[in-house]
């Protein structure tokens, strides 16, 4: 039987009243569960309490948009190169072996696989790294899938503003493969800490300059149409006290850890203990890559993800060491 349009509407109303059909609301596009891109920003020498004393609207915004803790721990010794090696390898210092803190080319490269290698092998991810200190080159192995940019702190123009601008410019000009994993080191706060003292006015001013630079970076990702598909992780290699660091003092060991992006809880305060070492596995989790095998101590910070209930830990984290 053919039902004409007016009769069709009346029939629908009758069926609705009888509870035999339901109105279907338009389905909104589901938010992505995983990130297409991950940006890890290591703010050299950033103490958590500096975020309360300095004006940091960009980092405050990431904290509100994502998950964070101000009680994360770096590794011992609390020095830049060993800490960066731990963040990138997912291993403590005594296992990755990079226990020095100066650029010494004859020592060669870290022997353990790093996050760039793991992401490239398991997810075909291209990478980009932007360094403010040459000594971190001990952790970065040259690869055709990796864009490397070093802007030395010995050059006056090499500040956070320039480096974050380089990140956006490099993405725009990349031709062979667009980076998906970015690691950015910003040393402004550390330089001010060594020169004028941690928590001094110049140090807090440097923290504010870094915050503005990160804001420029976020805007660049928005302009490129990448922001909503990108997870941003901001942390530090160490804190500092007086004009130094490297001890087991809480001022040196405590660091912030912030993550915001697809599939990450908003306004969430992380409850579990967090180590800088856990950054590597959390990056892989943010990409949605869980089937990989690497012998590391890094564990994803599972509670920050909206699908954390019943989630499976990376297979590599469950296998015993050989």
Across the structure, where does each feature detected by a protein language model lie?
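Bacterial N-terminal signal peptides
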Residues: 10-22
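Metal-dependent active-site segment of extracytoplasmic phospho-/sulfohydrolases and closely related
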Residues: 39-40, 58-59, 206-250, 257, ...
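Short, structured active-site-proximal loop/turn typified by the sulfatase FGly-forming signature C/S-X-P-X-R
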Residues: 49-83
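Short, solvent-exposed turn/loop segments enriched in Gly/Ser/Thr/Pro and often Arg
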Residues: 70-88, 130-137, 297
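Substrate-binding rim/cap in mid-to-C-terminal beta-strand-loop elements of soluble/periplasmic
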Residues: 84, 88, 248-291, 302-308
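His/Cys-centered metal/cofactor-coordination and adjacent catalytic loops
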Residues: 93-111
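Active-site His/acidic residue clusters
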Residues: 134-148, 171-212, 216
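Polar, surface-exposed loop/tail segments
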Residues: 290-321
């Amino acid at each position: 039987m053919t039902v004409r349009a007016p009769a069709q509407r009346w029939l629908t109303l009758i069926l609705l009243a009888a509870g035999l059909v339901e109105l279907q609301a338009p389905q909104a596009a589901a938010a992505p569960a995983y990130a297409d891109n991950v940006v890890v920003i290591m703010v050299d020498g950033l103490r958590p309490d500096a975020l309360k004393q300095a004006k940091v609207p960009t980092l405050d915004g990431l904290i509100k948009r994502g998950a964070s803790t101000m009680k994360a721990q770096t590794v011992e010794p609390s020095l830049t190169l060993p800490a960066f090696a731990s963040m990138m390898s997912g291993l403590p210092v005594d296992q990755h072996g990079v226990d020095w803190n100066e650029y010494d080319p004859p020592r060669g490269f870290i022997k353990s696989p790093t996050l760039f290698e793991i992401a490239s092998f398991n997810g075909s991810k291209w990478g980009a790294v932007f360094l403010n200190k040459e000594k971190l080159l001990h952790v970065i192995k040259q690869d055709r899938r990796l864009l490397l940019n070093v802007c030395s702190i010995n050059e006056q123009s090499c500040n956070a503003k320039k480096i974050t601008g380089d990140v956006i410019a490099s993405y725009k000009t990349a031709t062979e493969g667009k980076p998906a994993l970015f690691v950015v080191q910003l040393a402004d706060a550390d330089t001010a800490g060594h020169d004028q003292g941690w928590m001094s006015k110049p140090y807090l001013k440097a923290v504010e300059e870094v915050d503005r630079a990160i804001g420029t970076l976020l805007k660049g990702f928005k302009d490129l149409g990448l922001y909503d598909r990108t997870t941003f992780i901001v942390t530090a290699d160490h804190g500092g006290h007086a004009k130094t660091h490297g001890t087991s003092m809480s001022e040196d060991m405590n660091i912030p850890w912030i993550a915001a992006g697809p599939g990450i809880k908003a306004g969430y305060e992380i409850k579990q203990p967090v180590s800088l070492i856990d950054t590597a596995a959390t990056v892989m989790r943010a990409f949605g890559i869980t089937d990989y095998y690497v012998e590391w101590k890094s564990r994803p910070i599972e509670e920050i993800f909206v699908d954390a209930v019943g989630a499976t830990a990376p297979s590599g984290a469950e296998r015993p060491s050989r």
